[in-house]
Structures are given as structure tokens and as C-alpha cells.
Amino acid sequence: MMEQKDRYIRFDWAVKRLLRNKANFGVLEGFLTVLLGEPIRIVEILESEGNQLNETDKFNRVDIKARNSKDEIIIVEVQNTREIYYLERILFGVAKAITEHIELGQLYSEVKKVYSISILYFDIGRGTDYLYHGQNSFVGVHTGDFLEVSTKEKNAIVRKLPAEIFPEYFLIRVNEF
């Protein structure tokens, strides 16, 4: 009799083989739409090592690139093996995605927010949940209040929380399902 673990298709296998076809993007878009709570469209499925510009450039192991209705960037990575400094690597990946999507001479207001979603098939650390969300905010050291940034745009004051600008991270620990 076949073992229970052998009966299911792994998500990483499906992404790399079945869902690579544009006709099947609906499955991935549905997954991302539910996770992020808004409509998501897949832009492309990437070859993980194919986004390296030259041999000295670090590559970003992104498997899926998508966008939301605000044209923000979503990068999805399926990671099978444990890696030392994994959090530093996803930080690098987000930074690279940001810099790849702004041209010299563009205003910083054109920088797109990035969502990093890591589907992990290894134990990254201690915790009881299978889904973790990380986001940046600036909290007053003495008051505990959240900083709201104000900028003047077109004769109007625009207020934004840093969480609306800085990247968001999702870590999905598959082995904890």
C-alpha cells in the first residue's frame, strides 16, 4: 500500500510542472487572491536561476511574479531545502524586486510595494502556526503610537502608514498543516 505522503501532489511540483501553463494560472491566482484578500493576476512563472543578469549578480529565487489591483508586486517563492540566513535572503529578494521596477529618473513615489510569499517545506524555527505575516511599522518608543507619515502632493496632504509602503512577508510552513 502506498504511504499517505505519496498520495498528494506537492505545491512546488504543481507550480513547476502543471501550473506553468497560462491556462492554469487561475489556480495560482485563486490561492493568492484568498491569501491577500484582493484580486491578483499572475504576470509570469520564472525560472528561479533565470533572473540573474550576470555571473556575479545574486539571483532572486522567485518562482511566481504577480500584481494586485494597485499594481503592487507579489513575489512567490517555493523553498524546499533549509537555508542558513533564509530571512536575509528573502529581504534581498524584496530589495532586488523593488530596484528592478524603478528606472533612473523616476520619482521615489513610483516605488511599488512588494509582497513576499515563501512556501517553506523545511522547519524555519519555533512557532505553532503554519502561516506567519510580517510587516514594518514605526512605533513610538515612549508612547507606543504608530507613526503616520504626511506628505504634500498636488496641494493636498497625503497620510500613509509605513505599512502601506514597506514590503509585507508571508511565511507558509507547509509541514505544519
Predicted region positions:
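Elongated, amphipathic alpha-helical interaction scaffolds
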Residues: 1-177
